[in-house]
From Swiss-Prot:
Gene behind this protein: ydeM
Keyword annotations: 4Fe-4S, Iron, Iron-sulfur, Metal-binding, S-adenosyl-L-methionine
Organism: Escherichia coli (strain K12)
Binding site for [4Fe-4S] cluster 1: C12, C16, C19
Disulfide cross-links: none
Annotated [4Fe-4S] cluster 2 binding sites: C257, C263, C278, C328
Full protein name: Anaerobic sulfatase-maturating enzyme homolog YdeM
Length: 385
């Protein structure tokens, strides 16, 4: 089980054009800050429901708005309830509030920090803006430099939209240049209707927002970056999507929930203790309990698991079904013969067709006990052939 905690709910100090939390303000009427009793109950139950290694993820909105004193209490309660278990903390942030005091705290308590950044300035500032409409690039870069000066481990999260999707190498080389060793690319899709479950909808009952990334462009973007990575950066740069497929091909299963067979065990706890089945499905019908009233260990993603397992006939017949599993239920909005398939289907096929030969080559390397970074030599040979 993994639970993402949202101590400040949907609240944020930025107003990014594409943020799906902008619609949440009218939905939530509960207290927007996690109080002490809810925090304590969550930490106690989550540690009890976890194995010997417990991974906490703090997200938003913008979690740093909860304040440093809140996170000092996080450490206090974790230490109280950890017993012999080892605790890990990850913080996903826009970086705006990361001053010296924050960075010293994050270093002292060994937080892994995820920084949201969408590429070089002209690409990042296209959608990631302040409440006053100004670009945020300079402040984010300053935060990254401050993290580096305090030797805080960080990674990057990049939202692929209709603009930066056309600049894969510029984005990739930029992220490398700022010192990102671990990268995650999120494909952006938002509709005019809150994206819940389109399986029962008729065609054309929704519109795709302009900033969403076109499927084939996304596939080409990721394929271009994959080829750069597989020829030059394996073992040095870690890209979440690619690492997930390496894990899958080596027989260990996907590490990315999008392509897993089930949606179970990726829950969200809201600031008032409400538990939802997924970060992308924080809607009333997907609420499964409250940490202050129910036992966390008894909760699971029943509805999403059912949606995930409703694999359309088109997917069942696809050669990539074993490694794709129909993609994320959030993305299943494209009608095919009265069924809904992933909006990103054609893009995924472009990426899979690029990756699979190299993944198979990695499997052969592993069988022969050859370090996987040797795929870079193999990849160059394959390209020359």
């Amino acid at each position: 089980m993994h639970v993402t905690a949202k101590p400040s709910s949907f609240q944020c100090n930025l107003k990014c054009d594409y943020c799906f939390y902008l619609e949440k303000e009218s939905q939530f009427t509960h207290e927007k800050w996690m109080d002490d009793s809810t925090l304590k109950e969550f930490i106690k139950q989550y540690i009890a429901a976890s194995g010997n290694q417990v991974y906490f993820t703090w997200q938003g909105g913008e979690p740093t708005l909860a304040g440093l004193d809140f996170f000092r209490k996080v450490i206090h309660y974790q230490q109280r309830y950890a017993g012999q278990k080892r605790i890990f903390n990850a913080l996903q942030t826009n970086g705006i509030l990361l001053n010296n005091e924050w960075c010293a705290f994050l270093k002292e308590h060994e937080f892994l920090v995820g920084i949201s950044i969408d590429g070089p300035q002209e690409l990042h500032d296209r959608y990631r803006r302040s409440n006053s409409g100004n670009g945020t690039f300079a402040k984010v870069i300053a935060a990254i430099e401050r993290l580096k000066s305090y030797q805080v481990e960080f990674n990057t999260l990049t939202v692929i939209n209709n603009v930066n999707v056309h600049y894969p190498l510029e984005v990739y080389h930029f992220l490398k240049s700022i010192g990102s060793k671990h990268m995650q690319f999120i494909e952006l899709l938002e509709t005019g209707t809150p994206n819940i479950d389109f399986s029962g909808h008729s065609e054309n009952t929704f519109r795709i927002i302009d900033f969403s990334v076109p499927p084939t462009a996304y596939g080409k973007f990721m394929s271009t970056i994959f080829m750069q990575w597989v020829k030059n950066d394996v073992g040095e740069i870690f890209i979440r999507q690619f690492e997930s497929f390496v894990s899958r091909f080596l027989g260990n299963g996907h590490t990315s929930c999008i392509f897993q067979e089930s949606c179970k065990d990726n829950l969200v706890v809201e600031s008032n203790g409400d538990i939802y089945e997924c970060d992308h499905f924080v809607y009333p019908q997907y609420k499964i309990g409250n940490i202050n009233k129910s036992e966390l260990k008894t909760m699971n993603s029943v509805q999403l698991t059912a949606q995930k397992k409703r694999i359309p006939a088109k997917c069942q017949q696809c050669a990539y079904k074993p490694i794709c599993n129909g993609g994320c239920p959030k993305h299943r909005i494209t009608k095919v013969n009265n069924e809904t398939v992933s909006y990103f289907c054609e893009g995924y096929k472009i990426l899979f067709s690029t990756m699979v030969p190299y993944m198979n080559a990695m499997v052969e390397l592993a069988k022969n006990r050859v370090p996987l970074y040797h795929i870079m030599d193999v990849a160059k040979q394959m390209e020359n052939n």
